[in-house]
Amino acid sequence: MGLSPVNIFKPFGLGRAKAVIAAVSGGSDSLGLLFLLKDYLSTLESPPVLIAVTVDHKLRAESALEAENVGLLCQKHGIMHCVLSWDDPKPAHGLAAAARTARYRLLVQAARDAGAGFIVTGHTENDQIETFLMRKARSGHCEARGLAAMSPRSLLEGSVELARPLLTVSRQALRDELTRRGIAWVDDPSNANIDYERPRVRLGVAAEADGQEVLEQIAQAGAARERNNAALVEALADPATLGVDAAGMMFLNADCYAALSPGARQLFSGLLASIAGGRRFLPGDGERRRIERMLSGQDAPRRLTVFGALIERGEKGAPHRFRRERRNLPKLDLVPGQHIVWDGRFCFFNSGGRSFEIAPPGRQELIDFLKNSGRDIESRRCEALLISPALYEGGKLAFVPFLPGAEWPQGVHIERHFAIFDHVLPGHDFALAQAVEARLGRACAEIS
């Protein structure tokens, strides 16, 4: 008896989508996914359109032909198919990570173009075990958040859900399913290239590991992650726990912080460092422990710079402070019709007809701007503006947001951006992200 498409896919609610993107490389995992998904969608009264998307990474001479063969197979079975190519220059280092980033960028764009609410991938139980072993080797200890491995659901770019419905299905079960259906697959030779981390783990430690034991460790790590997340969600429900000013400086109540467990404290302060620095990831385990020790008074320094964030310990009941350090702040062009993220902290939309440059103001030009506009801002507020975006027009400082009653160009809108959540949000962290956004908000207020 084969695998049950209904049991596999029903929990994901795919039926509410207009279209579903299936990521299909031509390997056994993705082809198994495709045909099981096709069978499931055929059971729905009003099924979404199924679109198979093959990403040609242009890393092997055979890849174009393999993508073409996937298209022929899809045509034979009445499945829409398209090929997207990664045509960018390939990096000398970190190729696998760069390819993964490019792949998801292309898949998200395909989903948006098709109005698809879901991207579905063929990650299997074997991949889950390998992911755990890879992350455990990197972290060196058993309490790392990443040991919860891959979430069955994630949200990409705030708009498209990534579903991994096969995380409890083995690769062999999928191959047996394809064999039963008479469908052949391609074995990508890069999957056996031990120059890459995953094949090295797959052919080494994963081949020798007790799979059931690893899955139990994943469940334990997931439970620990949920406990720390839940502690932060509960703390954030109290408005006194965390505050933020217009420019994004955050104020963490020292007593609330001290009342948390060490693991929850490390998560909380690491998360705020990532938000303040505009980063997509948490600081490493060691850095999070270092921040927690400093804020808890176990280490002497009263301030640290981590991940682009300046963190200051509050004394005598004062709140701990997190803000962007004044280094490596970008300059970006904002043209009509554009939507861009500045420094991982602010999102700009330009529906007007004028072009601007977004950059932090220089100290003297900010002083002159404030003087010419008749404003008197205290020193601490002025420092906040120096790490905030301003608009330049024709090379001249033209608009400074967050000032009371400040003029602002027609059609330009700014809101807060959370890089750590807004690009890839694992399902493990859905509730935590909602709690952070509810407390900090997206709207940008004024500095008075």
UniProtKB/Swiss-Prot annotation:
Name of the protein described by the UniProt record: tRNA(Ile)-lysidine synthase
Gene Ontology annotations for the cellular component aspect, listed alphabetically: cytoplasm
Entry keyword Cell membrane: no
Enzyme class: ligase
Family recorded in the similarity comment: Belongs to the tRNA(Ile)-lysidine synthase family.
Molecular function (Gene Ontology), one example: ATP binding
Name of a matching Pfam family: ATP_bind_3
Localization (cell): Cytoplasm
Function: Ligates lysine onto the cytidine present at position 34 of the AUA codon-specific tRNA(Ile) that contains the anticodon CAU, in an ATP-dependent manner. Cytidine is converted to lysidine, thus changing the amino acid specificity of the tRNA from methionine to isoleucine.
Domains: entry comment: The N-terminal region contains the highly conserved SGGXDS motif, predicted to be a P-loop motif involved in ATP binding.
Recorded catalytic activity of this chain's protein: cytidine(34) in tRNA(Ile2) + L-lysine + ATP = lysidine(34) in tRNA(Ile2) + AMP + diphosphate + H(+)
Signal peptide boundaries: none
Gene3D superfamilies: HUPs (3.40.50.620)
Annotated ATP binding sites: S25, G26, G27, S28, D29, S30
Presence of the UniProt keyword ATP-binding in the record: yes
Keyword field: ATP-binding, Cytoplasm, Ligase, Nucleotide-binding, tRNA processing
Swiss-Prot/TrEMBL GO biological process terms: tRNA modification
Domain of life: Bacteria
Major location (coarse): cytoplasm
InterPro entries in the cross-refs: Rossmann-like_a/b/a_fold, TilS/TtcA_N, tRNA_Ile_lys_synt, tRNA_Ile_lys_synt_N
Gene: tilS
Species whose genome carries this gene: Brucella melitensis biotype 2 (strain ATCC 23457)
